[in-house]
């Protein structure tokens, strides 16, 4: 028995040794197994509007669970606030929020990148969670939110957590809402279109320009891009200082609702602020970049306003057509009455009718327009019979030796003798063949058509590209609209700015019709060999008038193209034709009394091209570069002197290397050797005043260096044109010439229209000289028909003013149509 017991103990010894070994501790039969931890235990019991504090580290994380019930047709938005005193960017506090359809995460401190590798840290972060809306089909929904707070810090990082429900998350129509945002605490709100509203305007204002902010409109989808580095990823957006406005249409949002997102940028350079920010060590940015904002969503105009405004634009300018028809009908009745009374029909004995022909009310283009009959003070000149001159003037039987010496006709045909006479008359400067001169001036018309086609086609292509980029990217900082009065239509963002340019096209075409009528009447007079069309009045050349009409129409087309997307890159689209219009008007004024010595079309358009090129250089380099202004001012002064010399000497003063020697001789003989009055006093007065004006412009530009170089150049052209026109009218009255009622009315209308137009032009509703946000500070509401703004009225009035200006040039010398050309003075 004892042996059996020993044998049993010997068999159990290996098992006892194994159980007692250190690598395999013996299990206590009384110790229960360790319970598994429920990962949601720490999240249970979390409440809204309660601040939770804690410490997280490498081995500890806290999970909070929040639940609420969303009712149908009610949107409940939740906002999470997290604050951490830790500034250690290597071990930030990590926040992960899990919802039914979205996971949102961020770190505290929140890091933002700026220019030149600068970084900004924010220890207080709050984000709005993407809301889930219950529907009538689903009924009330139980929403569950988990907030996971963790950190990889070995020693722990403290934090504070607050989760709240937003009471004012949905914006209402015509109700202003005030709130505060910062770079680490962006805000966004929901807006739903009412059933009776198809378009709205989001208006955002702030009393403080900085910090720079971004307003974005995004479709209803999660996640919402509400941080500086991703706000541009979705929707429509624009930068903002004090004002922002975005026009939206219901048809662009399938759910008929959208989010309005407000983001504060960490730096202000995008809004025109400083590129450099003084940063101190251990400086917190939480309180330095807060901005108070006010948002209001108002209904935009209805479709009926589009129709009413379009009809207004058409009818207001069609009334000019009716007015011209009425004036033409009155002239026709007066002509018929005079014909019945027998006021026509007296004969001068040469077979030509001497009558107050209706051509006196038009602008004829004379055949051999420089010639007069044999009683002229310039004998010896002949007119070809084909040009309407009196027949029977054949060559004499003089011997061939007469060509060996100068006769009186040879002397009178010498330009240097004729154009340097003290008293010049129109017959002295209208000696060239009518057909040659007519073809010369028609080149202006054909050249400007060619320029317009080649200029407009790439312009249209470019602005279409700009508009496409705006529509695709949603970046409304590309174009400088007046966003408070920018009414979209189709793919166009500001249809009202385009529609208002219709006046240039319609009035330009009307001016072409008026010129064409005068041209036809004149040709009929030439065919009838009317002596008044041949030897009386100002020689008429319609080429420049046709060119002016085309230029006015193209100004409207290119201005409309510019306003498709006005910005720094396409300002010269319409200003180019403004320069050409001003230049053509000055050429026409000069050509009126100097028909034989006007500039050729090629040199004139080449000069305009140089001006446009200089303008582009001025816009690019003229802002801060003093050297550009020094060079430009010197060229401006020298060009004024050279042009003045050519005008004073009627083109007989050669500009070459010997100009300085000749100028010194003239100065010595006329000013030092004997001080004599100028030979051409009237011209001298005009040129002295003109040079003073141009030198003043040059000095002003050199001292102040205006940023808007394009407007500065346009001001030079307009001032010179007005100065020349005023001189022309004064000299006309001084020469005992009359101003008929029609041109007098046009002069008064021109002055009134230009004064009103310039008032609206200087309202400055936007400007591409600054940033888009700075430009929006100047935006204003519509003032006409709730559709047109101040700049649109400028378009209306400037088109009308240009039309009347052209009529002034067309009709100013109608009183001379019954005056012989050898009695019309040149000035």
UniProtKB/Swiss-Prot annotation:
Amino acid composition bias (Acidic residues), ranges on this chain: 398-408
Protein known as: SID1 transmembrane family member 1
GO CC entries: lysosome; plasma membrane
PANTHER family linked to this entry: SID1 TRANSMEMBRANE FAMILY MEMBER 1, SID1 TRANSMEMBRANE FAMILY MEMEBER
Gene Ontology MF terms in the entry: cholesterol binding; double-stranded RNA binding; RNA transmembrane transporter activity
Pfam families (UniProt xref): SID-1_RNA_chan
Signal peptide (from-to): 1-19
UniProt membrane topology term: Multi-pass membrane protein
Biased composition (Polar residues): 364-374
């Amino acid at each position: 028995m004892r042996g059996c017991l020993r044998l049993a103990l010997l068999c159990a010894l290996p098992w006892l040794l194994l159980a007692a070994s250190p690598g395999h501790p013996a299990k206590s039969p009384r110790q229960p197994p360790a319970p598994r931890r429920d990962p949601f235990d720490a999240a249970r019991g979390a409440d809204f509007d309660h601040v939770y504090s804690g410490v997280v580290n490498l081995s500890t994380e806290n999970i909070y669970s929040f639940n609420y019930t969303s009712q149908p047709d009610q949107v409940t938005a939740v906002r999470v606030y997290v604050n951490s005193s830790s500034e250690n960017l290597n071990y930030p506090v990590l926040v992960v929020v899990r919802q039914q359809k979205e996971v949102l995460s961020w770190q505290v401190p929140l890091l933002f990148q700026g220019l030149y590798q600068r970084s900004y840290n924010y220890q207080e972060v709050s984000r709005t969670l993407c809301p889930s809306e219950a529907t009538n089909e689903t009924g009330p929904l139980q929403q569950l939110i988990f907030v996971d707070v963790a950190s990889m810090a070995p020693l722990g990082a403290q934090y504070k957590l607050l989760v709240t429900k937003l009471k004012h998350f949905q914006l209402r129509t015509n109700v202003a809402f005030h709130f505060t945002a910062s770079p680490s605490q962006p805000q966004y709100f929901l807006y739903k279109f009412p059933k009776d509203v198809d378009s709205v305007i989001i208006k955002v204002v702030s009393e403080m320009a900085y910090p720079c902010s971004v307003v974005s409109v995004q479709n209803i989808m999660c996640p919402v891009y509400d941080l500086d580095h991703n706000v541009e990823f979705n929707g429509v957006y624009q930068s903002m200082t004090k004002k922002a406005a975005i026009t939206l249409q219901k048809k662009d949002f399938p759910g008929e609702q959208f989010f309005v997102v407000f983001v504060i940028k960490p730096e202000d350079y995008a809004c025109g602020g400083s590129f450099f920010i003084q940063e101190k060590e251990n400086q917190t940015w939480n309180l330095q970049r807060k901005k108070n904002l006010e948002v209001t969503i108002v209904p935009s105009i209805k479709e009926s306003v589009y129709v009413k405004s379009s009809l207004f634009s058409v009818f207001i300018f069609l009334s000019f057509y009716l007015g011209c028809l009425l004036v033409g009908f009155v002239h026709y009745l007066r002509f018929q009455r005079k014909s019945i009374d027998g006021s026509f029909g007296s004969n001068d004995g040469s077979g030509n009718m001497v009558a107050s022909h209706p051509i006196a009310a038009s602008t004829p283009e004379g055949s051999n327009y420089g010639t007069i009959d044999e009683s002229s003070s310039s004998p010896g000149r002949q007119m070809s019979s084909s040009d309407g001159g009196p027949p029977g003037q054949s060559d004499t039987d003089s011997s061939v030796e007469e060509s060996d010496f100068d006769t009186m006709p040879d002397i009178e045909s010498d330009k240097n003798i004729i154009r340097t006479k003290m008293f010049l008359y129109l017959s002295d400067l209208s000696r060239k063949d009518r057909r040659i001169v007519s073809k010369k001036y028609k080149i202006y018309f054909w050249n400007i058509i060619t320029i317009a086609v080649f200029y407009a086609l790439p312009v249209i292509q470019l602005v279409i590209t700009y508009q496409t980029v705006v529509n695709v990217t949603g970046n409304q900082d590309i174009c400088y609209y007046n966003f408070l009065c920018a009414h979209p239509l189709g793919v166009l963002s500001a249809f009202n700015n385009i529609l208002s340019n219709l006046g240039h096209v319609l009035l330009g075409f009307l001016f072409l019709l008026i010129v064409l009528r005068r041209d036809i009447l004149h040709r009929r007079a030439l065919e009838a060999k009317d002596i008044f069309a041949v030897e009386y009045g100002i020689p008429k050349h319609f080429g420049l008038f046709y060119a002016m009409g085309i230029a006015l129409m193209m100004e409207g087309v290119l201005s409309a193209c510019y306003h498709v997307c006005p910005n720094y890159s396409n300002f010269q689209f319409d200003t180019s034709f403004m320069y050409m219009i001003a230049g053509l008007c000055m050429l026409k004024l000069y050509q009126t009394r100097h028909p034989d010595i006007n500039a050729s079309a090629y040199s004139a358009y080449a000069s305009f091209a140089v001006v446009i090129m200089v303008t582009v250089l001025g816009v690019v380099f003229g802002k801060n570069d003093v050297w550009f202004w020094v060079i430009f001012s010197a060229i401006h002064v020298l060009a004024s002197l050279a042009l003045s010399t050519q005008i004073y000497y009627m083109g007989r003063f050669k500009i070459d290397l010997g100009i300085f020697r000749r100028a010194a001789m003239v100065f010595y003989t006329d000013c030092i050797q004997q001080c004599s009055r100028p030979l051409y006093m009237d011209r001298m007065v005009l040129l002295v005043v003109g040079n003073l004006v141009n030198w003043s412009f040059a000095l002003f530009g050199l001292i102040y260096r205006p940023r808007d170089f394009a407007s500065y150049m346009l001001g030079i052209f307009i001032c010179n044109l007005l100065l020349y026109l005023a001189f022309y009218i004064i000299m006309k009255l001084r020469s005992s010439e009359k101003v008929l009622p029609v041109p007098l009315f046009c002069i008064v209308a021109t002055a009134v229209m230009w004064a009103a137009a310039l008032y609206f032009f200087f309202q400055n509703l936007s400007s591409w000289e600054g940033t888009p946000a700075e430009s929006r500070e100047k935006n204003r509401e519509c003032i006409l028909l709730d559709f047109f703004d101040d700049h649109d009225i400028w378009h209306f009035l400037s088109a009308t003013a240009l039309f009347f200006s052209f009529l002034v040039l067309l009709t100013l010398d109608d009183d001379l149509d019954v005056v012989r050309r050898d009695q019309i003075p040149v000035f």
